[in-house]
């Protein structure tokens, strides 16, 4: 499952009264930090409306509704405070600083590194 789907899976299992035997783990060595972003291209024809859309999504009441719909963590602190305490403390949804200490945002390192990565990944996946 993907990181943001853990909450959805937990809810489905609980609704069906099934035993839950999955644990969400971030390796101690770290991993990539997951994020989705809204951006406005510099040559956008309707920059003002795009900014209004982003501002709308950043409203705490809207961010909570978005969280409830997609069950992916919200970075909006005011929205997070509006969630049930059990959800706020769910480390699978909102990892703490200790869990994120060794995590990083992946960045493109150029064609040579990309080719090496893909080659190594194919080797790992091979029989």
Report the location of each language-model feature.
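Periplasmic-binding protein-like
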Residues: 18-42, 88
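Mature extracytoplasmic/periplasmic domains
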Residues: 41-101
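Ligand-binding pocket segment of bilobal, Venus flytrap-like solute-binding proteins
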Residues: 1-27
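A general structural signal for well-ordered alpha-helical packing
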Residues: 3-6, 37, 50
């Amino acid at each position: 499952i993907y990181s943001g789907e853990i909450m959805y899976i937990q809810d489905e299992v609980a609704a069906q009264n099934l035993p839950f035997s999955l644990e969400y783990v971030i390796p101690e060595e770290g991993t990539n930090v997951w994020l989705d972003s809204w951006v406005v291209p510099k040559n956008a024809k309707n920059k003002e409306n795009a900014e209004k859309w982003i501002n709308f999504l950043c409203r705490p009441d809207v961010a909570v509704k978005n969280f409830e719909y997609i069950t992916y963590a919200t970075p909006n602190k005011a929205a997070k405070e509006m969630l049930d305490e059990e959800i706020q403390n769910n480390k699978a949804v909102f990892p703490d600083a200790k869990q994120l200490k060794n995590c990083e945002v992946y960045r493109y390192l150029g064609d040579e590194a990309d080719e090496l990565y893909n080659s190594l990944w194919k080797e790992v996946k091979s029989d």
